[in-house]
Design a protein with these regions (language model features):
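Active-site activation/catalytic loop segments of kinase-like enzymes and analogous catalytic loops
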Residues: 80, 235-279, 295-314
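Juxta-kinase regulatory segment immediately upstream of eukaryotic protein kinase catalytic domains
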Residues: 1-27
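Active-site catalytic-loop/activation-segment of kinase and kinase-like phosphoryl-transfer enzymes
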Residues: 1-11, 110, 146-149, 153-195, ...
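Short Pro/Gly-enriched beta-strand edge/turn motifs at strand-loop
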Residues: 18-25, 79, 186-198
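ATP-binding pocket architecture of kinase catalytic cores
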Residues: 30, 39-151
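Active-site acidic catalytic loop and adjacent metal/ATP-binding pocket
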Residues: 28-55, 191-236
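ATP/Mg2+ or Mg2+-diphosphate-binding catalytic cores
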Residues: 252-261, 298-351
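All-alpha amphipathic helical-bundle segments outside canonical DNA-binding/catalytic cores
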Residues: 281-295
């Protein structure tokens, strides 16, 4: 397998015919993820009409402190998911695939983000955008609803294989925190069992996170990174996404930003739009229960799993442990109840 780098990317594109030979270009590595080599190739001359391009190559060894590996062919799960979602989501929401090189586990795609902001960075600055939360609810609801409507074409083949989801989520997140905190080993095993045996599965993104959401000048939300997609439980997406909003609420409080309540209000905005969009779910109350449990598990995993967040103070990490372990032990079933408990904890810490 040929290995992509900033030093050879432009030459490779010229040689393969993916970039015009008369257009000088430069390559720049994009940071933020841990699992792939991602490079932006763009014209050197700003006046050039040639659009920039994103190259992505799968890496077996992830860039984390703890050793973490995943199979190379997960990149074809990503391209398959992108092709499907490109047809069901609004234009410019998902990049368009330009070429694929099977032997190099590499593909090229259109660039959504050259002039975009990453929503994660806006949240870390304390910026509250209810409109983006609503857009996220619409997009995730559409993914889950469209998955159900196309279940015959999606539930077989690559998306039915959970190997990558296990390597990148179940093991480094759930099994890891169960070992660190044996008191929640049984609830965690129950979550895994529910995901595996859920009667009504759908397309699950499994990396639906503000770090993978690009915001343009008109507040349009673009979505990237689909390698963990699979045919599974939509509640995982809900818990995974909401965990990011809640964890950033801890940060906002610690920094003294006047946005704590507004951060939590974004959760309600997201949840309402999601429920309006994913209307084919068989048991909405059961989905909410599983979503709250995944929310607690994902929050704890970002403190004590293999890929912890780097923006929480030690005291906040302890608060996350107490809150989430309690929610899993008590089997908290309503999102509103979880948020009320969170608000009470915030008030206790500020009194």
């Amino acid at each position: 397998m040929w290995t992509l780098s900033t030093e050879n990317a432009v030459e490779h594109l010229h040689f393969a015919g993916y970039w015009p030979p008369h257009v000088p270009a430069q390559a720049r590595m994009l940071t933020g993820g841990v699992s792939n080599m991602v490079i932006r190739v763009e014209p050197i001359e700003p006046s050039s009409q040639q659009p920039s391009m994103i190259l992505k190559q799968s890496s077996e060894l992830l860039r984390t402190k703890a050793e973490w590996r995943s199979r190379l062919d997960r990149i074809w799960i990503e391209t398959e998911t992108m092709k499907f979602l490109g047809d069901v989501l609004p234009p410019q929401t998902v990049p368009v695939i330009l070429f694929e090189e099977q032997e190099n586990y590499l593909f090229g795609m259109t660039d959504l983000g050259q002039t975009c902001d990453v929503w994660k960075l806006l949240l870390l600055e304390g910026r509250v955008e209810p409109g983006l939360a609503r857009s996220a609810g619409l997009i995730l609801g559409t993914i889950h609803e469209s998955g159900l409507r196309h279940n015959e074409s999606l539930q077989n083949g690559r998306l039915a294989d959970w190997t990558v989801f296990d390597e990148l989520r179940i093991d480094p997140y759930y099994r890891t925190i169960a070992k660190v905190h044996p008191i929640i080993a049984e609830p965690i095993q129950q979550l895994i069992h529910q995901m595996e045996h859920l009667p009504q599965k759908t397309l699950v993104h499994a990396d639906f996170s503000p770090k993978n959401m690009l915001i343009d000048s008109e507040n349009h939300l673009g979505l990237v990174d689909f390698e963990t997609a699979h045919w599974g439980d939509p509640a995982f997406d809900l818990g995974f996404f909401l965990s990011h909003l809640v964890l950033k609420t801890f940060r906002a409080m610690r920094l003294g930003l006047p946005t704590r309540e507004e951060f939590l209000d974004m959760i309600s905005v997201f949840w309402e739009k999601y429920q309006d969009t994913f209307c084919s779910v068989e048991n909405a109350r059961a989905l909410e229960y599983r979503a709250v449990q995944h929310l607690a598990a994902c929050m704890l995993a970002r403190v004590d799993g293999k890929s912890p967040v780097d923006y929480l103070a030690e005291a906040d990490q302890d608060s996350v442990r107490v809150l989430t372990i309690e929610a899993m032990k008590n089997q908290t079933s309503r999102l509103e109840a979880f948020i009320l408990t969170l608000k009470d904890r915030f008030h206790q810490e500020t009194d």
